[in-house]
């Protein structure tokens, strides 16, 4: 059993390496929305300022919108940021997320000619409830196994779409989510992602802002410096799978009453995901 576990891990790493080696270098890019800000206006403004991003990671829209983007940006690398593909949930392959959602994602990947499909390791909906923000997975061994199985299913669907159309398949990437309201489970976050990557040949996205939320909201800031926390976390995280690093996207949240929400006068600010913030 132990030998089988390590053989599986080595096989997944080998498959990932083969897929990753087929990706073109993308350089430094932006994660963008088609509509807000207007994507073509943004690109024009950047070019006027003498800035040329290596790529634009486009958030889910409609397939026709993605086709429009590709027509207007024929030479730009356009990887895809999916939404609504709740791979952390046990019913993913059978529910609308894994059927209609995956079909839409595959069509949009095809329209953009994306090198990868990035998705948060999180969900916003459960048994009919919508939370309006990302909730992290259960950080347990069972949850890691189920997430890996769902990622393998998703990659199979992406591969099948590529075969039908004679294109290169996009690589599925799993993004480390923010710590929002709470986190549950017995596994440390790096150990969870290690358990996932031992079982599936996916890539990872490391979001530095999301890493900061873990430091802030687990209370690690009370025990460690940020530098010590980050070094320990990244040493355990499967960095060999990281394809993309996100380095922006947080804004300080100011609650009414201010100091009453702080643990003490030295508490760090409340930072949250702020995808609507202006690009500066």
Regions of interest found by a model, annotated:
Residues 4-7, 15-16, 97-204, 213:
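Active-site acidic/histidine proton-transfer and metal-coordination neighborhood
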Residues 26-32, 54-58, 76-82, 115-119, ...:
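Hydrophobic faces of well-ordered beta-strands that scaffold small-molecule active sites
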Residues 42-45, 70, 182-199, 215-227:
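Distinct, well-ordered alpha-helical segments
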Residues 91-96, 134-144, 214-280:
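Gly/Pro-rich active-site loop or hairpin
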Residues 34-36, 60-64, 84-86, 121-125, ...:
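Active-site-proximal loop/turn and secondary-structure-junction residues that shape catalytic pockets
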Residues 2-107:
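N-terminal pre-domain/capping segments
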Residues 43-50, 63-80, 100-115, 155-167, ...:
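Acidic (Asp/Glu)-rich catalytic clusters
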Residues 40, 90, 127-129, 184, ...:
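Short acidic, gly/pro-rich beta-turn/loop elements at beta-sheet edges
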